[in-house]
UniProtKB/Swiss-Prot annotation:
Residues 1-28, 33-52 are annotated as: Disordered. Keywords: Ribonucleoprotein, Ribosomal protein. GO terms for molecular function: structural constituent of ribosome. Residues 1-26 have a biased composition (Basic residues). GO terms for cellular component: cytosolic large ribosomal subunit. It holds the Pfam family Ribosomal_L35p. The gene is rpmI. Belongs to the bacterial ribosomal protein bL35 family. This is Large ribosomal subunit protein bL35. GO terms for biological process: translation.
Length: 64
């Protein structure tokens, strides 16, 4: 049986932390910043963790 391939799009978007969690970037960061407050834009710079409901599915997508 051939090796499973990782999902290349998911591999570029998610990174595993040292504790095993998955880190992701935030949405709403590409354009339309004039409508957003400075506080909102600052919060969007921070990375976030993948929710527990999505963790298992994404983990299988990026498994190597």
């Amino acid at each position: 049986m051939p090796k499973m391939k990782s999902h290349r799009g998911a591999s570029k978007r998610f990174k595993r932390t040292a504790s095993g969690k998955l880190k992701r970037g935030r949405a709403y960061t590409s354009h339309l910043f004039g409508n957003k407050s400075t506080k909102a834009k600052r919060k969007l710079r921070k990375a976030s963790m993948v929710s527990s409901g999505d963790f298992k599915r994404i983990r299988h997508m990026i498994a190597k």
